[in-house]
Amino acid sequence: MDSAVADWAGSGLAYLTGPRDGPPDYSRVAVLAEARRVTADITRLTGVEVDAAPMLTGRAALRGLSRHGRISAGGATRLLPTADGWCAIALPREDDIEALPALLETDTPPAEPWPAVSAWAAKHSSTAVVARAQLLDIAAAALGEATASVPTVRSVADTAAPRRVDGLLVADFSSLWAGPLCTQLLARAGAVVVKVESFARPDGSRRGEPAFFDWMNFGKLSYAIDFDNDIDALRELLAAADVVIEASRPAAFARRGLSANAIPGRAGRVWLRISGYTGQPGRTAFGDDAAVAGGLVGEGADGPVFCGDA
C-alpha cells in the first residue's frame, strides 16, 4: 500500500467514500494530498497547526456518519441518474420539501420525496433538472458542470501595509461550514472574531450536532441581532471591521444597505464573499452538491459515489 493510499485510509476518508455495502473507494486519494498542501500553507502563513484529515472528516466523526454511495454522508443530498448523465439534488431545508410539488409539477407533495425526485430526474436532462431546481431555490448540480476559477478581486480603497493576523477585527456573517472554518482558523491565529447571527435566521448548523457548531465556532464572540431593525449597529460593526466574511446572497445585504459597495471603503480592509458558483451569485449551493458540480466524486464500479462528507 503506497503512502497516499495509506493516508487516505488512516484519515477516515475511505470510510466515507464508496458504496454503502461495498468496499471503500480509493479513487480520490490525491484529494487528501492536495488538502495537506493547502493546510501546510495556512500553517506557514498563520503559525496555526492545521491537520487536513480531521478538517475533512471531523463532522462525520462527531455524528457517527459513514459512506452511503449515492446518498451523502449527512443524508440530505442524492446523486441521481438523469436522461443524459448524473446530477446531485439537496433537500436539507423544510422549504426544499415544500417546493417539491412545484419541482415535480404535481398538485400534491409526494408521500416519499426521494423516489419521486429520482423518477422525475431520470426523465430530464441534467441541464433541465438543474435549471428547474434553481428556479425554486433548491441546490442542484450536474456532475462536472463547474470548472476551477480564480477568486475575483476588486480594489475599492487604498492598500495598507501588511499586518499580523493577531488583533484584527473579523466580522463573520457566514454559516454552516466553509466560512466558520475560515474564521475559526483566524481566531486561532489571534484575530478577534465576532460571529454575527440574525435572530430570525441563526446559523443552520445550530439545528444539527451541537459539538460540530461548537467546533466550528469556538474562540469567537457571538452577536445576535435583528437584521431588519438594527441596521445602524450592523453598519458600525462593518465599518470597524478589518475583515468581513459573508456568504449570503448579495441582494440580502444590498437591500439593507450593508453591502461592500454601501459601506465606506477603508485602506486595508478585506471583504470576502463566499459563493457557490462564479458569476451566479444567487445560486444556492451546499457542500455535497458543489463537490459534484466540480467533479469531486468517487468512481464506483457502476457510477459515481459521494466523496467524503460535504
Label each residue range with its predicted role:
Residues 76-83, 214-216:
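Short acidic-hydrophobic surface loop/beta-edge motif
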Residues 111-112:
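Glycine-rich active-site loop/strand segments that organize a redox cofactor
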Residues 1-68, 73, 92-96, 116-137, ...:
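N-terminal helix-loop segment corresponding to the beta1-alpha1 unit
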Residues 79-91, 222-225:
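Short hydrophobic-aromatic micro-motifs
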Residues 142:
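Charged, structured surface patches that assemble and position nucleic-acid processing machinery
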Residues 103-105:
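Extended active-site and interfacial segments that coordinate phosphate-rich ligands
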